[in-house]
């Protein structure tokens, strides 16, 4: 009976010692949070393991995550996966549908990234356009008009300059045949008669003013169809056109004239652009929006993935994943880290404590046997 009591007593003592030892060991992982000193000597095991090695742990966790978990290869594979493609494409489609549904304008879109497009156009647009036009004038002012125009436009004008004769003569004939033309001829005759006095009075003895006006009108109309008159008009137009093409830009417009045109044009362009910026994009560019919804989402998703893949290494270096994780862990309160680890490994820590009690009890059992037989 005495021997049984000794064994039980040793088992209980061993279990208590083993269990409490493990509990203390687990607590010493976290506590104390700061070192303690007796006089100038630091108390051993202060601070606890995790507070003491906190920076090293943070560095190691960051290294492990960067080198073995969130690696460049793994992220690249995920980016190129079908799920990523579908997710990015779906997001683009949602934004495009919102663009159509909400009737968003360019101004509303740019305002979402804190850009006032109207203000930008007014403050920078005028100056930029005028500056570009003036730079163009300075660079090309000695060149001929023909050399400045696109070759296709010059070719088109060369081929159709003769058509100007038909157009001009047709317009002149229509004007002369109209009531306005008749009235203008009569008005000019009245002025002419008033200025010439007696000479015209003698002429009116043979013809009335109306007959004279009618005769002049008929002759002018006939001239618009006369081959010689048309040849003269064609020659004049061709010569003027050729002179215009061969004229340097600075002879057609001097610097002050061009500057005035540039300023007026820049104001017109920016004002027009500001008005257009307030119109819904779907109204302003319906075909472009259809293209965006139909084809661009897939192409844009591929482009985004491709560019991310190409620049992933640079991005990861800029992000500095290891440093970011290390910084974040070092900002955590030690209480929070303790709570986090206990929540994650609560079951395992309890098993460790239980194992301490069990091993302590087993050791106590053998110590009891030794105490009895020795």
From Swiss-Prot:
rRNA-binding is among the record's keywords: no
Keyword vocabulary terms for this entry: Cell membrane, Membrane, Transmembrane, Transmembrane helix
User: What's the main place this protein lives?
Assistant: membrane
User: Which residue ranges traverse the bilayer?
Assistant: 4-24, 354-374
Work out whether the entry's keyword set contains Transmembrane.
yes
Which cellular compartments is it found in? Cell membrane
UniProt cross-references to Pfam families, sorted A to Z: DUF445 (PF04286)
Query: Which topology term describes how it sits in the membrane?
Result: Multi-pass membrane protein
Among the entry's GO cellular component annotations, what is one? plasma membrane
Q: Which family does it belong to?
A: Belongs to the UPF0754 family.
Write the protein's name. UPF0754 membrane protein SAB1779c
Identify the species of origin. Staphylococcus aureus (strain bovine RF122 / ET3-1)
